[in-house]
């Protein structure tokens, strides 16, 4: 079936309207009318081939929310009319250790929502900057937020799970001091989630202008990471630091703030590498630097349910489909609080 979308034909061209083809639903598939799709910084990286390997035409978008309009005859979990979401994963091998553990995000054969080879047919996946999508029911997620919050739920499908998964894995909660580095699309979700988990949350920013905003998001303290005295006041005090910054920076500035056995987890993906950390800083206090990538389907559903229970959504700015290129430029300037979301109904205008 032909539908309308917005995508790029090359790394050097702006995004533009295009028609794409979706498969008809199979026995286990769910067909979704997309209401909103979040704009992730990784969309920009992929469209401009900054991470290499982009296949064109590229239709980005992996923060998808909408309503079920049809299901295959073997689908058991969903019915037409259900509010659902689709995140970064639309398929995996389903039988490896990672898939059996509900960690499809680490499956060697995970299929991304866009720019991945399609497993059962020629071509590559096309994402949520489009009117509809067809996905196997295993990778569809139930949304329990009220309808009026649906647009602000969209970024939870990437920014939400990207921050929730490491916070859960490293046991953020009451009695724990948690740092969040960066107050952008990822960082603002990290602050909200760590606060809701009961941790003492310290936000790190290089911008004085973000100090009050960070407190409004739930930070107990805010530190200007360019202020040596403010940083020194927190030496050896953090159980866990969630580093959301994608730009290369000095990781040693933050590892020295960890307690013995503390961990800093990186979720921002820089286009060029960070400077190598000072190994002795890690050795002397058994510090760890780790990475984390989104989350599996069960954990993503857990995150959505947690957010619905605690009234958590992203802070968003709604845009039309014809404003995506402008939104990309604004995103590069840091001119968004904190996530753009496309109103997919404007694809027909």
Model-based region annotation:
Residues 77, 93-181:
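NAD(P)H dinucleotide-binding glycine-rich loop of Rossmann-like/cofactor-binding domains
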Residues 269-285, 297-303:
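Rossmann-fold NAD(P)-binding glycine/threonine-rich loop
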């Amino acid at each position: 079936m032909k539908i309308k979308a917005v995508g790029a034909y090359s790394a050097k061209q702006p995004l533009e309207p295009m028609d794409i083809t979706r498969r008809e639903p199979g026995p286990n598939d769910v067909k979704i009318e997309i209401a909103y799709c979040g704009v992730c910084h990784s969309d920009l990286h992929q469209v401009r081939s900054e991470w290499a390997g982009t296949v064109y035409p590229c239709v980005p978008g992996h923060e998808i929310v909408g309503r079920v309009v049809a299901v295959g005859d073997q689908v058991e979990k969903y019915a037409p009319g259900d509010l659902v979401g689709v995140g970064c994963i639309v398929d995996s091998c389903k039988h490896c250790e990672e898939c059996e553990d509900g960690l499809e995000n680490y499956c060697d054969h995970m299929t991304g929502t866009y720019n991945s080879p399609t497993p059962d047919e020629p071509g590559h996946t096309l994402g949520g900057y489009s009117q509809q999508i067809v996905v196997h029911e295993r990778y569809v997620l139930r949304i329990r937020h009220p309808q009026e919050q649906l647009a602000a739920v969209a970024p939870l499908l990437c920014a939400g799970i990207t921050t929730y998964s490491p916070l859960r894995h490293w046991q953020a909660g009451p009695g724990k001091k948690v740092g969040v580095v960066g107050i952008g699309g990822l960082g603002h979700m990290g602050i909200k989630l760590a606060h809701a988990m009961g941790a003492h949350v310290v936000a790190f920013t290089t911008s004085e202008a973000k100090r009050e905003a960070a407190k409004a998001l739930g930070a107990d303290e805010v530190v200007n990471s360019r202020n040596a005295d403010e940083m020194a006041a927190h030496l050896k005090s953090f159980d866990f630091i969630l580093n959301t910054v994608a730009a290369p920076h000095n990781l040693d500035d933050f590892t020295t703030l960890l307690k013995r056995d503390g961990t800093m987890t990186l979720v921002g993906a820089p286009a060029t590498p960070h400077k190598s950390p000072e190994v002795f800083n890690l050795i002397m206090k058994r510090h760890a630097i780790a990475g984390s990538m989104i989350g599996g389907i069960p954990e993503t559903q857990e995150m959505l349910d947690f957010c619905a229970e605690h009234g958590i959504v992203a802070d968003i700015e709604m845009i039309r489909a014809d404003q995506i290129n402008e939104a990309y430029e604004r995103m590069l300037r840091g001119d968004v609080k904190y996530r753009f979301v496309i109103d997919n109904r404007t694809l027909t205008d």
